[in-house]
A protein has these predicted regions:
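Catalytic strand-loop segment that frames the active site of acyl-thioester-processing enzymes
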Residues: 1-58, 72, 76
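HotDog/MaoC-like acyl-thioester-processing domains
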Residues: 1-20, 96, 101-141
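A broadly conserved detector of short glycine/acidic/proline-rich loop/turn motifs that flank catalytic sites
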Residues: 24-26, 35, 92-94, 106, ...
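Glycine-rich loops and low-complexity Gly/Arg-rich segments
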Residues: 45-47, 83, 112-114
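Terminal targeting signals and extreme-terminal segments of soluble enzymes
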Residues: 53-55, 61, 66, 110-111
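Hydrophobic beta-strand-centered segment that forms part of the acyl-chain substrate-binding groove
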Residues: 63-101
Length: 141
């Protein structure tokens, strides 16, 4: 049948409730390799250039995890048990040494003790706020 309409979670038009800058270490992609991902795109400058990048890029799951940690620490009191779901769309790359800007909008109880949802947008500060993660939603208790 026909595909149904897509509902992308757009960030509200108001200013974010919170914003946090998360520095990414220069050696972060090399450290992240300890998780077992040996893709040379994250460590080999020549391979990265062949793939069309200026230099090796950070693992997407690393930026994904750093974002969830920033949201959890900022709006959920660091309590990971409150997270019910986390969804996002990878919108761009992160280079080691850059800074992630995580902007957050809280619905429901505003990130307090009750349940609700947080919409986030993540960008790379050093590249004129280039999008990194989009359509990001964290459902929480």
């Amino acid at each position: 049948g026909e595909r149904g309409p897509s509902r992308r979670p757009e960030p509200p038009t108001r200013a974010p409730d919170k914003a946090v800058d998360v520095p990414v270490r220069e050696d972060q992609a090399l450290l992240y390799r300890l998780s077992g991902d040996w893709n040379p795109l994250h460590a080999d400058p020549e391979f990265a250039a062949t793939a069309g990048f200026d230099r090796p890029i950070l693992h997407g799951l690393c930026s994904y995890g750093a974002t969830l940690k920033a949201v959890t620490d900022t709006l959920l009191g660091g309590d990971v048990a409150r997270i019910r779901s986390y969804a996002t769309r990878f919108a761009g790359v992160v280079y080691p040494g850059e800074t992630l800007r995580v902007r957050m909008w809280a619905d429901g109880d505003g990130g307090g003790a009750g349940s609700g949802r947080i919409v986030a947008a993540v960008s790379a500060v050093e590249r004129d706020e280039a999008p990194v993660l989009a359509d990001t939603v964290i459902e929480h208790t």
